[in-house]
A protein has these predicted regions:
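Bacterial N-terminal signal peptides
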Residues: 12-22
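Bacterial N-terminal signal peptides that target proteins for export
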Residues: 2-12
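General marker for long, soluble alpha-helical cores
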Residues: 27-168
């Protein structure tokens, strides 16, 4: 009778071992996903900082009004160049480059610009706001990179028309 128990005990132990392997894999996968998400957020924040720097550089070279014109032309539903300029001018102690990133993020995640600015003022990063909105960080990062490239092109070949200038 004792010999009959041994195979059953071995089978039960083998089944228990097999059941714990997938649970360990799921746990490891969850940790891997968190690391990947953290890395993606870090990359997005880095791209947002590069965009902010390029926006400041373009504003110094071309003027903020021109950057507002370019920004309005590359976004939809966030505001006209005039509305964006007025919104920025109403802010206190808010960096121009960070404002540009906030406008592009508002365009990409379909959240009100005021909400994004409030979260940035409260200390959240672009990456945290994007994660909270459950939007693909890689797409937002790509959008930021595309606009940064557009600003660089505009510095090399400045626009011939200022959207704030009135036509005679």
């Amino acid at each position: 009778m004792k010999t009959d128990r041994l195979p059953r005990l071995l089978v039960a132990a083998a089944i228990a071992a097999l059941l714990t392997i997938p649970a360990g894999n799921v746990l490891a996968q969850g940790q891997s996903d968190k690391k990947a998400e953290k890395k993606e957020m870090k990359q997005l924040n880095k791209e947002a900082n590069k965009l902010a720097d390029k926006s400041d550089e373009a504003a110094n070279q071309l003027g903020r009004d021109v950057v507002f014109c370019i920004l309005a032309a590359h976004t939809s539903g966030v505001g006209t160049a005039q509305q964006l300029r007025d919104k920025f001018n109403s802010l206190v102690d808010f960096q121009f480059g960070q404002f540009v990133a906030a406008v592009l993020l508002a365009d990409r995640i379909d959240k009100p610009l005021d909400d994004i600015i409030a979260k940035l003022v409260a200390g959240m990063s672009i990456g945290q706001i994007t994660k909270e909105a459950d939007v693909n960080m890689g797409e937002v990062r790509s959008h930021f990179g595309d606009f940064r490239s557009e600003l660089a092109r505009s510095e090399t070949n400045p626009p011939t028309k200022n959207c704030f200038a009135t036509n005679p």
